[in-house]
Amino acid sequence: MNTLTSPRPGPAPAHEAQANGPTAPPGRGRLVNDAPMRMFHWLFALSFVGAYLSADSEHWRLVHVVLGYTVAGLLAFRVVYGLVGPRPYRLSTMGRKVSGAWAWLQTVRAAWTPGGAQPTVAWRQAPVFLMAVSLVALLAVVLPLTLTGYGTFHEWGGDWGGEVFESLHEFFGNTALSLVGVHLALLAGQSFWRQKNLALPMLTGRLEGRGPDLIAHNRVWLAVLLLLCVLAYLGWELVIAWR
C-alpha cells in the first residue's frame, strides 16, 4: 500500500468539535434523545393509549377525560420545548423537515413525469420525511382532539352540539391512532432496513455507533420535573373525584 496516498486523518479542529458536541466514548453510543424528550414521549404515549382504551366506557369516563387533559398539557410542554429546547427538537427544525418532505415529493413527481428532467430521487430519505410529517400531524391533531373532547364533556350546544362534538372527537381520535400506527410502522421498517433498534434511543437516549452527541446535556432534572407535574395533576384530579 502506498501510504503517501492515504494519509492518516488528523484531529478535528477545536471549533468543529464544539459545534458537533462531545464525541461519545466507544461502547456507549451517541446521545440523540435527552431525558425530557424521552419522558414526554412515554407519558404522551401512555396517556393517549389510556384515553383511547377508556373512550367507550361510561364507567371510565373520568379517566378518559383526565388522560385527555394530560395529553393536552404534554402538548403544551412540547410546544414550549420546541421554542426554547435543543436545536434538534425546535419547531423550526420540524418545519424544515416538513418543507424538505414537500420538496422531495416534487422531485418524485418530476421523476415520474414523462419528458421531464428526470431528476434522481433519494429514496432513502422517504422514511425520514414520512416520519417527520407523521409526527407533526400527530401533534397537530391533539389540539382539535382535546377541544372536541372538552366540548363533548361539557355538552356544548345542547343535544345537537354534543352529537357533533362527539362525532368530531371520535374522528380526530381515530386519526391520531392511525398516525401512531404509521409512526410505529415507519420505525419498525427503518429498524429492519438499517439493522438497528431505532426505538431503543427513546429508552436509553443513545444510538449505537460512534460520533458526536446530538444533544449536549441530558437535563434529567427537567424530566423529573415533568413527571412530578403530571403526577401532581393526576393526584389532584383523584382527590377531587373522591370528594
Q: Where are the regions a protein language model picked out?
A:
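Membrane-embedded alpha-helical bundles that constitute the cytochrome b-like, heme-associated redox core
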Residues: 1-243
